[in-house]
Amino acid sequence: MSTAAPLVFALPKGRILDEALPLLEKAGIVPEAEFFDKSSRALSFATNRPDVKIIRVRAFDVATFVAHGAAHAGIVGSDVIDEFDYADLYAPVDLDIGHCRLSVAEPVSMVESGANARESHARVATKYPNLTRRHFEKLGVQAEVVKLNGAMELAPSLGLASRIVDLVSTGRTLKENGLVETSRILPVSARLIVNRAALKTDSARLGALVDAFRAMVAAKDAA
């Protein structure tokens, strides 16, 4: 990307967005009014800075856009970073927002019977196939992954999978669907990510952006 072109900053739709916007504003980047128009179908937005534009995409796509250089920087959960493990992604700042955890959950009835504890093979519904396989490999269990993009909690009750791996915050959704959290794979928080090549070729602008976010987190920790 040419250094004369605007920096492209990718923001995720969903749970992290509301917490990310105040940080972005503190970094001196404010989206145009259309960004906040819920009826708008636009995905690309101008900002108060002519050298920065924002794209709003699915959380999993933030990492892909940045890793492949279509966006220079973005904000995304550490779960997505760990799932894809892109070599071209650099995550210099833990933003201390979007806290949750990636966990294994099972039907309460199976936990009480101990049935899953005896399995050497498990069918698991998740949108995190790589993290799921790695987790179960460590346990000596062969995981057959059923890839879903949502409604994970339905899978056990409909016989699609015996367990699920998904993000958990309060555990309320699990409880309402007859599931219980049985193990935690990793803690999750949102990170600032940048494209490694872009950081080298446009170090002045991207370096300043990284420094701004890093300073905000440091100030928050010191408060």
UniProtKB/Swiss-Prot annotation:
Species of the source: Novosphingobium aromaticivorans (strain ATCC 700278 / DSM 12444 / CCUG 56034 / CIP 105152 / NBRC 16084 / F199)
Complexes and interactors: Heteromultimer composed of HisG and HisZ subunits.
GO annotation, biological process: L-histidine biosynthetic process
Domain notes: Lacks the C-terminal regulatory region which is replaced by HisZ.
Entry's family note: Belongs to the ATP phosphoribosyltransferase family. Short subfamily.
PROSITE patterns reported for this sequence: ATP_P_PHORIBOSYLTR
Any Pfam family hit: HisG
Compartments, as annotated in UniProt: Cytoplasm
Any single GO CC term annotated in Swiss-Prot or TrEMBL for this entry: cytoplasm
SUPFAM superfamilies: Periplasmic binding protein-like II
Record's protein name: ATP phosphoribosyltransferase
Origin superkingdom: Bacteria
GO molecular function: ATP binding; ATP phosphoribosyltransferase activity
UniProt entry keywords in alphabetical sequence: Amino-acid biosynthesis, ATP-binding, Cytoplasm, Glycosyltransferase, Histidine biosynthesis, Nucleotide-binding, Transferase
Enzymatic class: transferase
Reaction(s) this enzyme catalyzes, per UniProt: 1-(5-phospho-beta-D-ribosyl)-ATP + diphosphate = 5-phospho-alpha-D-ribose 1-diphosphate + ATP
Gene behind the chain: hisG
PANTHER family to which the protein is assigned, alphabetical: ATP PHOSPHORIBOSYLTRANSFERASE (PTHR21403:SF8), ATP PHOSPHORIBOSYLTRANSFERASE ATP-PRTASE (PTHR21403)
Entry function: Catalyzes the condensation of ATP and 5-phosphoribose 1-diphosphate to form N'-(5'-phosphoribosyl)-ATP (PR-ATP). Has a crucial role in the pathway because the rate of histidine biosynthesis seems to be controlled primarily by regulation of HisG enzymatic activity.
InterPro entries: ATP_PRibTrfase_cat, ATP_PRibTrfase_CS, ATP_PRibTrfase_HisG, ATP_PRibTrfase_HisG_short
